[in-house]
Amino acid sequence: MAKLTRKQKAVAEQCDFQKSYKLEEAIELVQKITYTKFDASIDIAVHLGVDPRKADQMVRGTVVLPHGTGKNKRILVLCTPEKEKEAREAGADHVGLDDYIKKIEEGWVDIDVIITMPEIMAKVGRLGKILGPRGLMPNPKTGTVTVEIAKAVQAVKSGKIEYKVDKYGIVHASVGRVSFSKEALRDNAKELLATLLKAKPASAKGSYLKSISLASTMSKGVDVDTSTNFGF
């Protein structure tokens, strides 16, 4: 991290990292204490009151952030020949089948999302050991195994992200970039939180939103007050 100026140090010292802030305040603080030459990502960590070891408490799905993440996601579509034109016209970065399966088997994973078709999954399945650990394995639950290729590609390009609790019950996601307006970051964060609330498992007991933290790629985390209703 670059050496802080006197003004930057003063701003950082004003932030009480033991305190919880309203969502808008937390966003503003993270923007102020981020000093990088690149447009850092602003990430949210939401600790849910679930036990991911139980199948009925595995929270995962997708959400379309109204202002996107600020990142142009590289999409690979593995499809049959008659779907290739549709995929390209929708904005897919890479389109094909056997040639890309071979490339992946040889170690190529320079992509962010893979979209495929149900009838192709038998071939894609053998890539599980490579794609699974990287979070790239297509899944019907996240809309990446579908016959509606164009719709799936357009959704990802317009800001659709996947979320999934880790083994500690925490959902990690990007809600935009430091350069975004405070309002855009707030809208994105609220959309994710609203989606997580709707996805609350019926078997989850006690407090559901246990804690929320915001941080940029190079900043400390700022806690968000979970006692507010966030406007919904």
From Swiss-Prot:
Keywords: Repressor, Ribonucleoprotein, Ribosomal protein, RNA-binding, rRNA-binding, Translation regulation, tRNA-binding. GO terms for biological process: regulation of translation; translation. GO terms for cellular component: large ribosomal subunit. The keyword Ribosomal protein applies. Part of the 50S ribosomal subunit. PANTHER family: 54S RIBOSOMAL PROTEIN L1, MITOCHONDRIAL, LARGE RIBOSOMAL SUBUNIT PROTEIN UL1M. This is Large ribosomal subunit protein uL1. It comes from Amoebophilus asiaticus (strain 5a2).
